[in-house]
Amino acid sequence: MAMTKKFKVSFDVTAKMSSDVQAILEKDMLHLCKQVGSGAIVPNGKQKEMIVQFLTHGMEGLMTFVVRTSFREAIKDMHEEYADKDSFKQSPATVREVF
């Protein structure tokens, strides 16, 4: 007889972006915005949201988006790499900013 148990895992994470990384990311975002503005490239969905967050909320909004997206992808990858994934199901990860 099979047995099913449901678990909810939660934890807090504090992310810190160094000034060097922030400067590089800001430079890359400005370059991306210029390319999109000139029509040189058509942004994909993730790039579009990064531009929206950058232009609307600045570096803080961009960092929040990048961290949230990275966590979702890491959790999804972790499940895909797990050897016995047929025994586990997981709901989509919810990552939210805490104020």
From Swiss-Prot:
It comes from the Viruses. This is Protein suppressor of silencing. It comes from Escherichia phage T7 (Bacteriophage T7). Plays a role in the inhibition of gene silencing by the host nucleoid-associated protein H-NS/hns. Disrupts higher-order H-NS-DNA complexes. GO terms for biological process: viral translational frameshifting. It holds the Pfam family Phage_T7_55.
